[in-house]
Amino acid sequence: MGCRIALGDVCSFYRGASVPRTRMYDKGAYLYIHYGDLYKGFDLHIDVEDPAKPIPYILNNEKIKDSQRLRDQDIVYVLTSETVDDLGHAYLFNNPKDKPTISGTETTIVRVNRRDLVVPAYLNYLMSSPRFIRELRQYTRGMKVFRVHPKDVARIEIDLPQTEVQHQIVSILDAIYAKQQANSKLNGYLSA
């Protein structure tokens, strides 16, 4: 049997670190997930071992808080954008070897604290759904730059099936996603 729960009861939210592009490099101490790069090459997942595009680095002299370090299965969430349509993009962070990685400016880390109730991959799909994004947008503030505060996201209630069902749903959605990616790649080859 599932349950209805507020995100803030099962997740913590942390703001990313502000590092300008001029201080990003091809090599360094930490991988750095820059907000602008999320829209150009990543879709639902950020796989550190096999990234869709190169991930830049920052040096160890940057002022980084421990809360800005990404952990495997965190969700990198976009809560600031120049358009309302770009709010609410979610990216599951896959980093099984725990390479040191920092979440960047204008991103929010969503960390699942209750994995006995929530499968991070399931939550990532849920947070990417049109229904969730509609709910999220009711909290939008701003005129030129649009924002949603993490405390507002924490108030959003979600229905959770049992974790076994969440795993089954993720397996189905992952298979569909993989097929879509393969088709996109094939279409890219055909149009070239």
Residue ranges and their predicted role:
Residues A29:
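Short aromatic-glycine-enriched beta-strand elements
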Residues H34-G36, N60-S128:
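A short beta-sheet element
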Residues S128-S129, R137, D159:
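Well-ordered mid-protein domain cores that form the structural environment of catalytic cofactors
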Residues M1-S18, R155-A192:
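Non-catalytic DNA-recognition/assembly elements of restriction-modification systems
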Residues L38-Y39, P96, R141-G142:
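Short glycine-enriched loops at secondary-structure junctions
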Residues V19, P100-T108, T140-V170:
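A short glycine-rich beta-alpha junction/loop motif
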